[in-house]
Amino acid sequence: MCIRDRYLPAHFEDTDGDAIAGLVAAFPLATLVCVHDGEMIANHIPLMMNGSEELVGHIALANAIHELIDDGTRMLAIFSAEDSYISPNWYPTKPVTHRHVPTWNYQVVHIRGRITFSHSRKDKLAVVGGLTKLQEQKFSGDRAWKMSDAPRDYMDRMLDNIVAFRIGIDSISAKSKLSQNLSLIHI
């Protein structure tokens, strides 16, 4: 079930699964939101889609969220692509009609699901390895850093100081507000 928590006209709704997965992969830093004791908690965490069923990530052990909320807590992960202010002065017909107002163009994906934390070394290695491999391929190519490049005792200490987690995906909604509701002369 997807709770409509934002204005989403049909012409801005994005239902292309590949495009949604592409946006999440290109802009992996999510705002991860939950409610604890009536207060909203937000963390900015890089996440990765693991197929279409789950998001994976990790937090610092010092981040108290894994102690504050229980496994199964509902989470909202918000992924935002690039965005921009759009001035009325940029429309070619503005000098003639003056029928334009400012707007903001953006793309966003909301993924809801339930979180499960893990302190197991196997899960931490899988999450850190997957996220690292994905990002290193994008930025370093053939010279990609691998976890095995670091001394084992150092990696062990780093892994001891994180908590892995998975968010089982319940729903996905995406919005691409890119002025596609305007005539072609304006975009």
Model regions and ranges:
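An N-terminal domain-cap segment
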Residues: 4-55
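A generic local secondary-structure boundary/capping motif
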Residues: 21, 100, 154-157
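Short, charged/polar surface micro-motifs in flexible loops or helix N-caps
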Residues: 37-39, 48-55, 61-64, 81-85, ...
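Histidine-centered active-site/metal-ligand motif
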Residues: 44, 58, 186
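Short, structured beta-strand-loop surface elements
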Residues: 61-127
